[in-house]
Amino acid sequence: MMSNKKAINILLAEDQTMLRNALATILDLEDNLQVVHSCATGKLALEYMQSDDGAKVDIVLSDIEMPDMTGLELAQHLFEAKARSNTIILTTFARSGYLRRAMDSGVKGYLLKDSPSHELIAAIHKVHQGGAAIAPELMVGSWMEKDPLTDKERRALRLAKDGLSTEDIASKLFLSTGTVRNYLSSASNKLNAKNRIEAARIAHQNGWL
């Protein structure tokens, strides 16, 4: 629903179709909120934001875990590109580490999916006005443990979690197999893990992947 005031244009990135459609309906019913585009992957969201239409987006509302590209990776790309939009993460994950990475990626809002719709709407308005909106239950735990992984270790572990071999990981990251082994070994040592699978599990549970 739109009033005479300029609408806040929203891009919605969520891989669950039913939830994506429900969110779009809720937001479009609100005064001065307009979902101008919705998509199921972070990669599609980034492609839209890099198009001419992307310049009109005020708020990117994104899930974290999506195919091709996570919401945190999407936020990082937009942050580095100095996009005029602001990003709000809406997720089921209250894991330690996610909020820290989100803030480092320029995210201005971080809410859980079980938050009431009025809190989400208020957060969108607050972020659009230059503020920040963080679910209070996330503020303490997310800062207790610092992410010990480098970006390269994180990328290698994420692919290991998906079951890829060292050779396949090396191919995807355009690295030598020896370099990949070093990254995985370093990550395992930092996390006190017995192997790459355990390291990936620990990192995932802490929100570091």
Predicted segments, located by residue:
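Acidic, metal-coordinating helix/loop segments flanking the phosphotransfer/catalytic sites
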Residues: 38-59
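Short, flexible helix-to-coil linker/hinge segments that flank and couple to helix-turn-helix
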Residues: 97-154, 208
